[in-house]
Design a protein with these regions (language model features):
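Non-heme Fe(II) oxygenase metal-center motifs and adjacent flexible, charged/small-residue loops
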Residues: 1-212
């Protein structure tokens, strides 16, 4: 993504190898949401089942060569949407550029994601503390992009029992973590608060990873 196309973000270091880029994706909000709607038309959002039999409150879809899925058999990446048997929608070029640029700004040059998990939160939806461990190469960072309602991001340590920081993520904010922070626990508190002018009472999160 050319430098002149990127809004100059406020950079906050929230870990040794974790950076919060305030408003980094703000100029691309409308375009990104149009891309999400196109992805949804090919691979609709759904509430997946965890291996423990619980229904996730967050609605999920994917784009890219691989999509993250969960059911009673476990967490994993698949090249096809289990609901249709068809490949996941291709990752929009905008998404690839945005994720690569954010990773570069956070000190992880050359990031080339091949999986984008799209999470949609309604009020009350949450994401419990977890680690991203289904990828083969932990040397690659995680890039998380927020749109819509403000959410409270929980960022902990490498063990679940360790304290968590609570960080407000607003429309257009991007969090990037990797290196020694790559396996830190993280989550999202139940969504609440004021509606957003663009998305209403909804939050959409794009999580970019290198799955293989």
């Amino acid at each position: 993504m050319p430098a002149e196309e990127v809004f100059a973000p406020q950079v906050e270091k929230i870990g040794k190898r974790t950076v919060l880029l305030r408003a980094f994706a703000l100029p691309r909000g409308d375009e990104a949401m149009a891309a999400v709607r196109a992805i949804e038309s090919a691979a609709p959002f759904r509430h997946m089942i965890t291996p423990g039999g619980f229904t996730m409150s967050v609605a999920i879809t994917n784009c890219g060569a691989f999509g993250w899925t969960t059911d009673r058999r476990g967490y994993r990446y698949t090249s096809a949407d289990p609901a249709t048997g068809k490949p996941w929608p291709a990752m929009p070029a905008l998404f690839t550029r945005l994720a690569s640029a954010a990773a570069g700004a956070a000190g992880f040059p050359g990031f080339a994601p091949n999986a984008c998990l799209v999470n949609r939160y309604a009020p009350g939806a949450r994401l419990t503390l977890h680690q991203d461990r289904n990828e083969r190469d932990f040397s690659q960072p995680i890039v998380s992009v927020s749109f819509g309602m403000t959410a409270t991001f929980l960022f902990g340590g490498r063990e679940r029992r360790l304290p968590t920081a609570k960080i407000a993520l607003h429309h257009g904010d991007v969090v990037v973590w990797g290196g020694e922070d790559r396996l830190r626990f993280h989550g999202v508190l139940p969504l609440k608060g004021d509606e957003h002018p663009l998305l209403g009472r909804e939050r959409v999160n794009l999580t970019f990873r290198k799955a293989d």
